[in-house]
């Protein structure tokens, strides 16, 4: 249970820092845009909440709060009740949803449930979703992506703004205004502004890969190279910007390759492997194929070389890529896949 201390809402250097960032990057949280804050009760999301509540009078966002009770530990219902009471005392509208038993057994399933609930609530409110992800989260994600195997998009993960769901680009957006703050910063925000924090013991569980990165890997790297977490977060941001540039240039390069049935396989195959891979990723994503790992992309890049024979390849989601002669085409999943 969080320590119930009085809330000291006042302008602080933390408010000034975020306010300046929002003026420099107005697309992060557009003024008057309804916002749905995903609040766990931990230090990052509570810092986000208290900063945006005070900045609301300048930026005029309608604010709503959402909390998801995953049921991962015996005290989760108490945290949900305490957080609801805390918000209600401050006239902050909050919705608390409880996950069905067994629906959040893994990190992936929990994330799917959480984001599905957020999407539903955001659509009801006409709001965008805001999370308290920090530069520290970005460094952890970079390490996880490197360990799993990734491409440029994976290295630039945790973008400041993106669609909540990739297959709904015109739907609710996911916004992360605290990527310029570290986890140490959010702890200081909560301390300086006397904001309560509810500690979730599942964040310490070694069963989750991110927790082990946070507790076992990053501390060692920080001892060896102090400040490395922030440098990794900065690298992720630069990579994200580089990818945006690459995407725009690749769109221009893709136009001459398009045919009535797909792509000109010979013109694609004559390109350098790295260019061929990038254009293939963009074209497939436009068709709805996104879950491609680095190993499969390398395999396809080699098999689509000009000197390679015709062939086919099954892709995630039931898609099938086929190529023969000049033609490269994509077959959609069978009905009911």
UniProtKB/Swiss-Prot annotation:
Q: What is its main location?
A: cytoplasm
Q: Name one Pfam family in it.
A: TilS
Q: Where found in the cell?
A: Cytoplasm
Q: Which residues bind ATP?
A: 40-45
What Enzyme Commission number(s) does the record list for this chain? 6.3.4.19
Q: What class of enzyme is it?
A: ligase
- Is this entry keyworded Repressor? no
What does the entry give for GO biological process? tRNA modification
Spell out the SUPFAM superfamilies in the cross-references. Adenine nucleotide alpha hydrolases-like, MesJ substrate recognition domain-like
**Reaction equation(s) it catalyzes:** cytidine(34) in tRNA(Ile2) + L-lysine + ATP = lysidine(34) in tRNA(Ile2) + AMP + diphosphate + H(+)
Gene Ontology cellular component annotations, sorted alphabetically: cytoplasm
Annotated InterPro entries: Rossmann-like_a/b/a_fold, TilS/TtcA_N, tRNA_Ile_lys_synt, tRNA_Ile_lys_synt_N, tRNA_Ile_lys_synt_subst-bd
- Per UniProt, what is one GO molecular function of this protein? tRNA(Ile)-lysidine synthase activity
- Keyword terms of this UniProt record: ATP-binding, Cytoplasm, Ligase, Nucleotide-binding, tRNA processing
Q: Which domain of life is it from?
A: Bacteria
> Has UniProt tagged this entry with the keyword Lipid biosynthesis?
no
- Which Gene3D superfamilies would you find in this protein's record? HUPs (3.40.50.620)
Q: Which family does it belong to?
A: Belongs to the tRNA(Ile)-lysidine synthase family.
- State the domain notes: The N-terminal region contains the highly conserved SGGXDS motif, predicted to be a P-loop motif involved in ATP binding.
Query: Which PANTHER family did the record assign?
Result: TRNA(ILE)-LYSIDINE SYNTHASE-RELATED
- What biological function has been recorded for the protein in this entry? Ligates lysine onto the cytidine present at position 34 of the AUA codon-specific tRNA(Ile) that contains the anticodon CAU, in an ATP-dependent manner. Cytidine is converted to lysidine, thus changing the amino acid specificity of the tRNA from methionine to isoleucine.
Protein's recorded name:
tRNA(Ile)-lysidine synthase
The source organism is Parasynechococcus marenigrum (strain WH8102)
